[in-house]
Amino acid sequence: MNRKVAVRETMLEYAGDPFAWGVLDCCQFAAKVAEKITGTDFSKGFFYASEDDAEGIINSANGLENLVTKILGVDSVGVEFLDVGDPVLVDIPVMGNMIGVFNGNHAIIKLKKRAVLIEGQRILKGWHLG
């Protein structure tokens, strides 16, 4: 699927859905976009229902970056190597690191109240889906 269409369709499909750990959180939103692009469900096999559960999975992988690298099976790269729809690691003040979706200039992140657009300079790195 076209990457821009994948991001737009995922945004529209889940725009009104509430945040839910393990169902529609920052990582699950990025996984839904990645599945539209690649046809692979990267969230398969990861079950959690709370922030504590999610933190446990992240900690057992020695951090969010390591977890995503393991799940995707590719190393992280700099922003200059990313395409629209690629998952990104974003530093958000007060909240810490989160996973978002690259839209070409910004990151789209599903937060508890809504999806937000985060300026590109907050993107630490990402994973090119190929």
What is each model feature region?
Residues 23-26, 31-33, 94, 100-102, ...:
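Generic alpha-helix signal with a bias toward terminal, lower-confidence helices
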Residues 1-59:
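N-terminal capping segments
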Residues 52-117:
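...with weaker cross-activation on analogous glycine-rich loops/strands in unrelated enzymes
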Residues 116-130:
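Glycine- and charge-enriched low-complexity intrinsically disordered segments
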